[in-house]
C-alpha cells in the first residue's frame, strides 16, 4: 500500500498527517509503529487522519507512536492547519477529536488557537498536581528543569502505582518570572520526552494558577513557545461562598492553547 502523507511539527512535537476523507486508510498497531519509527519509517510522535464528519467540519483520529489513542493538543493545532491547507475550512473550524468537540482558529502566519474542553478537577498529590486536559497529566515542580533527568524520572513515575496500568503524562515545571513557566514532558504512548506537549503545557498553565500565575500564561518548551488562556471557576458551597474541596482546586473553562504549527514536507511511503 502506498501512503501519501504530510509531515507537520508544532513546537517540535512532530506528526504524520493523512487525508482520509475517502476512508481508504486504516492501520494496524504494527503499521502505526512502523510509520512513526525514526529509523525505518517516516518518524513521528504520532499519526493523524483527517476524515469527514456528518455535522462538523472534520473528524480527527489521533494515534500515539505506540498505537494508543488520546487527545493531542499540539496535534489538534496541526490538524487545523492541515484542514485549512486541504480547503476543508476557512480560518475557523469545529471538529471532533478523542475527547469530543473542539473549536480552532488559524491566526496570522502559522499560529493556531485551539479551544480545549473544560476541566472539572485538579487533584493535589503531595507537592504535585494531577489534572486531565483531554489526556491525564501529573505536574511536578522542579527548580532547574534543564538539568532535570526527565526521561528516567518521568518513566519511573509513569510506570509506578497507581499509574502503571493506564499510564500518565509527567510534566516537570520550572517557575520563571513574568508569568512564564518552562515545561518538559515525558509522554505516555511515545514513552519518551517530546520537545513539546500541548495538553501538558495546558495542564501546567492551569496548575500554576494555584501559585498566582494569571491568564494568559507564557510557556517555554524545548521546541518553542506557546501560551494558554483560561478562566478559573471556584467551587462554591450552598451559600454561594467559594470553597476548594479536599483534593480539588476548582474548575477551568474557556481554555485556549495558542502556538505555531507548520508543514515540513510531504511524501509517499510504501507500507
Regions found by a protein language model. Give the residues of each.
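A glycine-rich beta-to-alpha transition motif near the start of alpha/beta enzyme domains, typified by
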Residues: 1-108, 139-242, 247-271
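Active-site glycine-rich loop that binds ribose-phosphate moieties when present
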Residues: 114-127, 152-157
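Extracellular structured ligand-interaction cores
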Residues: 111
